[in-house]
Each structure stands twice: as structure tokens, then as C-alpha cells.
Amino acid sequence: MISKPDKNKTRQRRHARVRGKISGTAERPRLNVYRSNKNIYAQVIDDVEGVTLASASTLDSEVKGNNKTEKAASVGEVVAKRAAEKKIVDVVFDRGGYLYHGRVQALAEAARENGLKF
């Protein structure tokens, strides 16, 4: 019997491979993205201390948009502004094993436009 590969399991393996190579520090924290079917979440993480420095998601009241891609761009804007308040400019982008396309790309480009460098 032919079995279909589990996309989320494949994504998790891809993310684990990438996480072995990248890590966030206090000077250059990691911008992590998690995408569910309904929402998208972004965190700026210092992996050395194990602390989240800034975060945003589509569940926040500041996030506006008519569709999921617009909301993802709004999340990128909000997380970039919250990081800027804590004087964070340089980050390492961790796409979480997702393809750089659609909502993940919209979030990343909005974060770049609002001052984050990666």
C-alpha cells in the first residue's frame, strides 16, 4: 500500500536540520516563525539565555488584514516594531522549515521593511 508522506513531519525534520546550524544570540537573536492553518506567530528569541525578546501573532489586536497573507505581513510589521523598541536590529531568520513563500515570505518582507536586517 502506498502511503502519503506526512508534510508536517517532513517540515519538522527540515526545521531540526536547520536549527542545528543556526542559533540566536543577544546581539543577533533568531526570528522564529510558526504557521498554523488559521494563524501565524513570530518570536525574536535569544537562544543563549532561552528568552523570548519580542513576539507577535495574528491573535494580537494590533494585527489587521483581510486575508491570511495580509495578516502575516501585519505580524511582521508588529514584531519588527516591538524588536526595535528593545533596540534589536539584526536577526537570524528561522523560517521553521516552511518554504519561503506566501505567508512566511510576506511576514519576512514586512519585518525587513520595518527595520529588521536579515
Curated annotation (Swiss-Prot):
Is-annotated flag, keyword Transcription regulation?
no
Q: Which GO terms describe its biological process?
A: translation
Classification via Pfam families: Ribosomal_L18p (PF00861)
Biased amino acid composition, Basic residues: 10-20
Q: Which SUPFAM superfamilies match?
A: Translational machinery components
Keyword Transmembrane helix carried by entry: no
What keywords sit in the KW lines? Ribonucleoprotein, Ribosomal protein, RNA-binding, rRNA-binding
Which Gene Ontology cellular component annotation is one that this UniProt entry carries?
cytosolic large ribosomal subunit
The cross-references to NCBIfam families, in alphabetical order and at most eight, read: L18_bact (TIGR00060)
The job of this chain, per UniProt, is described as:
This is one of the proteins that bind and probably mediate the attachment of the 5S RNA into the large ribosomal subunit, where it forms part of the central protuberance.
What name does the UniProt record give this protein?
Answer: Large ribosomal subunit protein uL18
**Higher taxonomy:** Bacteria, Bacillati, Bacillota, Bacilli, Lactobacillales
Gene for this protein?
A: rplR
